[in-house]
A protein has these predicted regions:
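Intrinsically disordered, low-complexity, charge-dense segments enriched in Lys/Arg
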Residues: 108, 112-206
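Basic helix-turn-helix/winged-helix DNA-binding cores
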Residues: 2-110
Length: 206
């Protein structure tokens, strides 16, 4: 591993270490206006930005989510704790899934848990999902090192001045293939959900 490659991997691991999810007890229990919502999201998800001037969520985005029924409409222009939890899910999903796919995923969650009066509410869903975070981060770090080593074992006969770039190119190709395959699996699962939903509807109609 060259000094440049070591510096790159240290930078990647430092970025991963900075990532954190919003803890349930950090989410306000009072309703917020739109400006307060965007400020809250901006402050608490800043570590996920690629560039400093990137926006986490804008008013236009949030209005579009409500218009497309990804998000229940606010009550008297105020957004509840449940709205914030839904927006966090949407924020992560929107980078890899289409609006219609997010609708398929979040529709049943909204219907059953959004205004639940039992202990199994949106906070329960959020806590259960994000409780897996630390385990996944540890796995990710080990997996990244394994893939980086694999990428460094190819192009052994390349010109020395090209080898470092080609190793990085191979590493990116490995990661991209992984992302592509996982995205395809997610889309297939969502298609199956849609298909099952359709079958259920047709059976009821019969």
């Amino acid at each position: 591993m060259t000094s440049n490659e070591k510096e790159m991997m240290n930078s990647i691991f430092a970025k991963i270490a900075e990532l954190d999810y919003i803890k349930p007890d950090e989410i306000p229990n009072i309703d917020l206006y739109m400006d307060q919502v965007t400020t809250f999201m901006e402050e608490n998800l800043a570590s996920t930005k690629r560039h400093e001037d990137d926006k986490i969520l804008t008013k236009t985005m949030i209005n579009n989510y409500a218009k497309n029924k990804l998000l229940p409409p606010p009550e008297k222009k105020r957004y509840s704790r449940e709205h914030l939890l839904m927006l966090i899910f949407i924020y992560y999903f929107k980078n890899i899934l289409s609006i219609s796919d997010i609708q398929t995923l979040l529709g049943p969650i909204t219907e059953k848990y959004f205004k639940s009066m039992t202990e199994k509410d949106m906070t329960y869903i959020y806590q259960e999902v994000f409780s897996m975070e630390q385990t996944q981060i540890r796995y990710l770090e080990k997996d990244l090192m394994r893939r980086f080593k694999s990428a460094g074992e190819v192009f052994e006969d390349a010109d020395p001045e090209d080898r470092e770039f080609l190793h990085q190119f191979s590493f990116i190709c490995l990661l991209s293939f992984d992302v592509y395959m996982k995205k395809m699996i997610i889309e297939n699962m969502i298609d199956h959900m849609n298909s099952s939903k359709g079958d259920g509807t047709s059976k009821k109609e019969k």
